[in-house]
């Protein structure tokens, strides 16, 4: 049994209205030029600092795509990913709190340092648009725009394994290189990196994976000159 994961988008919530970089990203939305808004225009997204507190469960890197790779077969009703496959739906989410039926002290469930929630109460049309991806076989991979609304369906009668890995597309840029250096420092100590809870399971492990065990690809990913 799994409660699933409610509909949301990642990479900041209240921050999408407040941060100057996000105000550039969504300028055409806020200025009323919706026809000119291009969710694929990535300029200024690498300048966003949406999560500045370490050791949460929020991803602070810039992701062109979020990715879901199945480690087991995944069937309908067994925790499949659901999406609203319309990146432009972010415009609806951003403008929704400004409509007349929303109290002045309410932002449709939004809070700082969290994911951006999408709910039946405030976004019924978007909830209605949530669509399941097809069944997956182990090894299949699914990718979606970083603004796409997504959820994971609850499971009441689990049939076999249901395992996936979240693997984003995180291109090299200053923002991601800064995080890579944090991961390098954490690996040297055997500590949990910044976007994960401070659990530090491996700190005292003998024979744990170290920087010396990295191949050329691992070194490049952590910004280490090979």
Where do the model's predicted regions map?
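Non-heme Fe(II) oxygenase catalytic core, chiefly the N-lobe of the double-stranded beta-helix
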Residues: 1-121, 127-134, 138, 153-158, ...
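Conserved double-stranded beta-helix
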Residues: 97-149, 153-226
């Amino acid at each position: 049994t799994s409660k699933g994961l409610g509909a949301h988008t990642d990479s900041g919530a209240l921050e999408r209205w407040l941060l100057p970089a996000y105000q550039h990203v969504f300028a055409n939305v806020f200025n009323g030029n919706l026809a000119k808004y291009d969710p694929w225009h990535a300029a200024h997204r690498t300048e966003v600092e949406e999560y500045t507190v370490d050791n949460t469960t929020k991803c602070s890197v810039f992701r062109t795509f979020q990715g879901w790779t199945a480690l087991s077969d995944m069937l309908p009703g067994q925790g499949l990913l659901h999406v609203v496959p319309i990146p432009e739906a972010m415009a609806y989410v951003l403008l929704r709190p400004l409509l007349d039926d929303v109290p002045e002290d309410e932002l449709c469930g939004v809070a700082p340092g969290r994911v951006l929630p999408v709910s039946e109460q405030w976004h019924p049309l978007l909830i209605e648009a949530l669509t399941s991806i097809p069944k997956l076989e182990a090894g299949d991979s699914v990718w979606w725009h970083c603004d796409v609304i997504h959820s994971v369906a609850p499971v009441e009668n689990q049939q076999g394994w249901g395992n996936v890995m979240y693997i984003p597309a995180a291109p090299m840029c200053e923002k991601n290189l800064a995080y890579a250096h944090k991961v390098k420092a954490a690996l040297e100590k055997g500590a949990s990196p910044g976007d994960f809870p401070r659990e530090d399971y491996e700190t005292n492990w003998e024979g744990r994976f170290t920087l010396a065990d990295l191949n050329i690809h691992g070194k490049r990913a952590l910004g280490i000159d090979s």
